[in-house]
C-alpha cells in the first residue's frame, strides 16, 4: 500500500478520516478502519498531515508557515491573573487584551483594555477583590456610557464567562484566538472599540498567519448565537475559505 498515493488521491486540502478511507478504497478496493487509524497516525508522525479540528485534517503544505497563536501579556494583565488565582484558585476565568488586535489592524487602537471573563457565580466576588487592589480600574459588565465615562488605559472589564469558551492550549486562563474572533461579534462592549470596517483585515490576517480550529470556533459561536452571522460575514466580506460549511 502506497500511503503517498492515498494522500495524493485526496483532492481536498482539508479532509476528514472518511475522505482518506474513500481514497484508499478507490485505490485498493478493500481497507479497514484499523488500517485507516494506523495510516492517520503515520501521516501525523511524519508531518505529512496536521489535525486542525475534530475529524478534520490538513495537508502539511497548506498549514506550513502558520503558527499556533500566542501573545505576550502586559504586566497589568499578569498581575490581574495572579490576583484572581491567589484569591479564587478554583474559579474558571479567561483573559485577553485589546492591544493584541493591533497585530491585525491598519488603524492602531490607542489604548489597552484587559478583558476578564469569569464564571457567572464568581463575577461579583472577583470584582470586589480586584477593586480593592486596582481602585478605579475595574468595571463589571459596563454599559457603553460607563465605558465612555469611567474606563481608563488598562482598565479591566469583567464579563460572564460563557460555557465552552475556548482557552489557549498552553494556559487555561488565556483566551484562544477562536474565542477572540467570536467575541468580535458577540461582545457588545468590544464592538464599540473596534471599527467594523477593520473586521475583514483582522480575520484575513488571523487566518493567513495562524492555525484556527474552526470546529472549536463555531462551537463557541453557537453558544453565543453568532454562528450564522460569523459564517455570513466571512463568506461575504473576506477571501477566507472555511474548511466546513456545515
Task: Report each predicted region and the residues it spans.
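Short gly/ser-rich loop at a beta-strand->alpha-helix junction or flexible surface loop bordering the NTP-binding
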Residues: 55, 71-151
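Short, well-structured alpha-helical interface segments that form or flank functional binding sites
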Residues: 35-38, 121, 125, 172, ...
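Short, flexible beta-strand-to-coil junctions
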Residues: 53, 120, 186-188
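Hydrophobic alpha-helical interaction segments
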Residues: 4, 134-246
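Residues in well-ordered beta-strands of folded domains
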Residues: 58, 115-117, 157-159
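Short beta-edge/loop segments at beta->alpha junctions of small alpha/beta modules
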Residues: 8-87, 107-109
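Short, charged/polar micro-motifs that form catalytic or ligand-binding hotspots
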Residues: 10, 29, 116, 167, ...
Amino acid at each position: 500500500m502506497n500511503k503517498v498515493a492515498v494522500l495524493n488521491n485526496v483532492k481536498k486540502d482539508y479532509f476528514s478520516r472518511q475522505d482518506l478511507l474513500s481514497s484508499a478504497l478507490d485505490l485498493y478496493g478493500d481497507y479497514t478502519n484499523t488500517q485507516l487509524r494506523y495510516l492517520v497516525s503515520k501521516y501525523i508522525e511524519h508531518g505529512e498531515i496536521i489535525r486542525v479540528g475534530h475529524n478534520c485534517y490538513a495537508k502539511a503544505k497548506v498549514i506550513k508557515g502558520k503558527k499556533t497563536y500566542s501573545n505576550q501579556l502586559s504586566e497589568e494583565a499578569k498581575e490581574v491573573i495572579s490576583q484572581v488565582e491567589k484569591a479564587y484558585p478554583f474559579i474558571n476565568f479567561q483573559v485577553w487584551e485589546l492591544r493584541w488586535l493591533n497585530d491585525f489592524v491598519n488603524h492602531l487602537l490607542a489604548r489597552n483594555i484587559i478583558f476578564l471573563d469569569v464564571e457567572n457565580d464568581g463575577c461579583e466576588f472577583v470584582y470586589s477583590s480586584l477593586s480593592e487592589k486596582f481602585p478605579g480600574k475595574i468595571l463589571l459588565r459596563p454599559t457603553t456610557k460607563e465605558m465612555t465615562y469611567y474606563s481608563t488605559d488598562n482598565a479591566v472589564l469583567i464579563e460572564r464567562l460563557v460555557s465552552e469558551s475556548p482557552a489557549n492550549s498552553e494556559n487555561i486562563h488565556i483566551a484562544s484566538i477562536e474565542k477572540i474572533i467570536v467575541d468580535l461579534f458577540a461582545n457588545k462592549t468590544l464592538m464599540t472599540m473596534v471599527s467594523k470596517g477593520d473586521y475583514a483585515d483582522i480575520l484575513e490576517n488571523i487566518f493567513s498567519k495562524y492555525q484556527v480550529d474552526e470546529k472549536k470556533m463555531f462551537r463557541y459561536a453557537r453558544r453565543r448565537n453568532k454562528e450564522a452571522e460569523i459564517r455570513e460575514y466571512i463568506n461575504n466580506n473576506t477571501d477566507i475559505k472555511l474548511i466546513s460549511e456545515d
